Amino acid sequence: MSGNRAVIALLDRAQTDSDAGQSEAAGASLERALRIEPRNPWLWFELAQLRLAQGQYAQAITLARKSNSFSGRQYRVQAENWRVIARARVSQGDAAGADQAFKRASDLEQQAGAEKDRDAGFHAQ
């Protein structure tokens, strides 16, 4: 996710705060981490998850999409983001949109698995 010690410490703090029900403090830690690594898709994903848990569905969708914009070929984080989008759409009453998002997540998960298998075969040669 990150090799930056400050970012790792902020992620740990965000998790501790979230576990303690301090979602605002968790969000502040994630936002600080994003100021250090603004193009880190995993940080955007973590913030999207937090906003989803807070019931901020439109914000969660926006953040998940932003994460995807920085994800490149990181299919796992893309799949996780599409799951956030799907759950937000369910909560918004958009069943059709949720189904599409869950399908996209599943497709990306398969793509990530296929790439992992291909890489394992390449390294075994």
What does each model-identified segment do?
Residues G3-A28:
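Alpha-helical segment of the N-proximal tetratricopeptide repeat
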Residues L43, L50, V77, N81, ...:
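TPR alpha-solenoid repeat register
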